[in-house]
UniProtKB/Swiss-Prot annotation:
Name used for this protein in its record: Probable polygalacturonase
Keywords assigned: Glycoprotein, Glycosidase, Hydrolase, Membrane, Repeat, Transmembrane, Transmembrane helix
Subcellular location: Membrane
GO BP annotations listed: carbohydrate metabolic process
Ranges occupied by PbH1 repeats: 230-256, 257-278, 319-340, 348-369
Protein's membrane topology: Single-pass membrane protein
Residues passing through the membrane, by range: 15-35
InterPro entries, alphabetized: GH28_Enzymes, Glyco_hydro_28, Pectin_lyas_fold, Pectin_lyase_fold/virulence
Length: 491
């Protein structure tokens, strides 16, 4: 059964490239779409291309960026075209939602905001180019759980694609590209010339029911994908590429978010591939919004100077119930890293990682209680973090310089650490001592080389000792719909 369009978005210039959405129950069928023109006439369109993809919602209305004056020549600024398109399509939120189609071309733009019940779809040959004009990046206040910007104490530049207080938002495509052209920002950062914190590529705040999928993200000025204070988030099939020495180009950073799923992503980064966060020092403690119920699976990461999965260091609101599996780490500094320090407060607990393959690493595991700077001098020196219930199992690592560096906090040890069925093959020039452990407590089973005495071996019969929850999280029950669009040209 096919549900076709019944309404046309008004006031669009003819001729146009129209973009239609309908929901398909079984398979895509060939159709001829009819468009009612302003005089009440109908004429048949020729289908040039049919697109089908999976999404949390399909849309009843659609338009192309060219309908709003967009020019994809790589030189014409399209910020207003994006803003006008989103404004017009926002009118259809209560009528089945709307989609904005970005066709093949190079679309130069500054920051623009999305709306609810909305899909931004990039053609496979579409490239969004971030403007190098600083005036195209509005400045907004720091995040309340951080108290200040990360690069500078004042505000922060709005992300290229931004949204706040939204519901049902999809950013997807046929592997279209978003290029942050971050070189200018990296130079300003290294030169100490930033008045405000660098923008991210995608940031959605205070939002729910989010899908970000099937895109390539290049050269972000800073973090790539940053959902914050949000819930019910699906990030799927994303490729993220940045020079390995580019500053703070984290891949995906869920921050004070609940019910998030990250899967089937490939990331090459100058910082952590996935960094789980929840606020900074006293600001994060006061805001009190944890990141919890997070699933990470089928992630491949290359990050020579940072971690594949990092927890912290801004974790003052708490991090709980993180489940990662089927992870591939290549030429990265550390596989799993927990970063915190005195003054952070908060907690990192109930962390489960299994099925990880690591090749050419500095450390397989790194935990430290002596990491990171503070937001300001008003942090509480008595705010000790709680690190407990850390479970790693079923892993193989090759060409590793050091198996683990585990450093808790004196008088505040990291507890409940469990490592089982892990084989680490050391590099030819590995450290003489493969494990260092201070102020940590836990157990191990079937681990090579033998861990520290503070992680006593429980015997080979208990190699499945460390927990991994059997029950699914709510985000795993989300079922995607088949959405299909026919791109038609009307001469």
């Amino acid at each position: 059964m096919v549900e076709t369009h019944k309404k046309k978005i008004a006031n669009l210039t003819q001729p146009i490239v129209s973009f239609y959405c309908f929901q398909v129950v079984s398979v895509l069928v060939a159709v001829v779409l009819l468009l009612s023109v302003s005089r009440g006439e109908c004429r048949k369109g020729r289908i040039l291309e049919a697109l089908e993809y999976s999404a949390i919602s399909c849309r009843a209305h659609s338009a192309s960026l060219v309908d709003f004056g967009g020019v994809g020549d790589g030189q014409t600024l399209n910020t207003k075209a994006f803003q006008d398109a989103v404004s017009e399509l926002s009118k259809y939120g209560s009528e089945g939602g709307a989609q904005l189609y970005v066709p093949a071309g190079k679309w130069l733009t500054g920051s623009f905001s999305l709306t609810s019940h909305f899909t931004l779809f990039l053609h496979r040959d579409a490239v969004l180019l971030a403007s190098q004009d600083i005036s195209q990046w509005p400045v907004i206040k720091p995040l309340p759980s951080y108290g200040r910007g990360r690069d500078a104490a004042a505000g922060r530049y709005t992300s290229l694609i931004f949204g706040t207080n939204l519901t049902d938002v999809i950013i997807t495509g046929d592997n279209g590209t978003i290029d942050g052209q971050g070189g200018l920002w990296w130079q300003r950062f290294h030169g100490g010339k930033l008045k405000y914190t660098r923008p991210y590529l995608i940031e959605l705040m205070y939002s729910a029911d989010i899908q970000i999928s099937n895109l390539t993200l290049l050269n972000s000025p800073s973090w790539n994908v940053h959902p914050v204070y949000s819930r019910n988030i699906l990030i799927q099939g994303i490729t993220i590429l940045a020079p390995v020495r580019s500053p703070n180009t984290d891949g995906i950073n869920p921050d004070s978010c609940t019910n998030t799923r990250i899967e089937d992503c490939y990331i090459v980064s100058g910082d952590d591939c996935v960094a789980v966060k929840s606020g900074w020092d006293e600001y994060g403690i006061a805001y009190g919004m944890p990141t919890k119920q997070l699933v990470i699976r089928r992630l491949t990461c290359i990050s020579p100077y940072s971690a594949v999965i990092a927890l912290g260091s801004e974790m003052s609101g708490g991090i709980q119930d993180v489940r990662a599996e089927d992870i591939v780490a290549i030429n990265s500094e550390s596989g799993i890293r927990i970063k915190t320090g005195i003054g952070r407060g908060g907690y990192v607990k109930d962390i489960y990682v299994r099925g990880m393959t690591m090749k050419t690493m500095k450390w397989a595991f790194w935990m430290t209680g002596n990491y990171g700077s503070h937001a300001d001098n008003h942090y509480d020196p008595k705010a000790f973090p709680v690190i407990q219930g850390i479970n790693y199992r079923d892993m193989v690592a090759e060409n590793v310089s050091m198996a683990a560096r585990l450093e808790g906090i004196p008088s505040d040890p990291f507890t409940g650490i469990c490592i089982s069925n892990v084989t680490i093959h050391l590099a030819a020039k590995a450290k003489k001592v493969p494990w260092t452990c201070t102020d940590v407590e836990g157990i191990s089973s079937g681990v090579t080389p033998t861990p520290c005495s503070t992680l006593p071996d429980q015997g080979p019969e208990k190699t499945s000792l460390c927990n991994f929850p059997a029950e699914s999280l709510p985000i795993d029950t989300v079922e995607l719909q088949k959405c299909s669009y026919g791109i038609n040209y009307y001469p």
